[in-house]
């Protein structure tokens, strides 16, 4: 069986201009799953990889807001939470579409871990946009208040950026 890797960006998992709810993300994933199912029908074993910028950023914000009531999780745990959520939605959406087409295939999620070099220079130059978009004024206020690095993101607004070191190994 031929294998095909499909990469979905985190921004591709949400519809521009719509609320970033779990239900809205699931609806986008279900639409995307129609295309993935077409590929499965052509005889491919499909591996779906995905980004998580908007999702992990929102999870971090949720943790910050709730931190007065419950301890906030560290960033790596928030990343794993976003992987689990996105994988869960892909499992739900793709399984539903495959089932409706009479295709009996298992869909599984794997939460990955990577090893990075603690001396990677990218730790000193944050570049991965996460979370929602802000106006320039909002971004400056957030940077001042929280000490975050904020950058303009492709003409769409300003976002927090975090370090994105190169993986040395996948665990």
State the predicted function of each range.
Residues 1-49, 59-64:
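N-terminal glycine-/serine-/threonine-rich phosphate-binding loop
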Residues 5, 10, 53, 72-74, ...:
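Generic secondary-structure boundary/loop-capping signal
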Residues 6-7, 48-50, 144, 152-154:
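Generic detector of intrinsically disordered, low-complexity, polar/charged segments
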Residues 12-14, 53-57, 115-118:
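Short, active-site-adjacent cap segments at secondary-structure transitions
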Residues 34-37, 50, 54, 58, ...:
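N-terminal, well-ordered alpha-helical segments
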Residues 47-54, 59-62, 134, 157-164:
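Aromatic-residue detector
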Residues 66-171:
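Ligand-binding beta-strand-loop-alpha-helix segment within the catalytic cores
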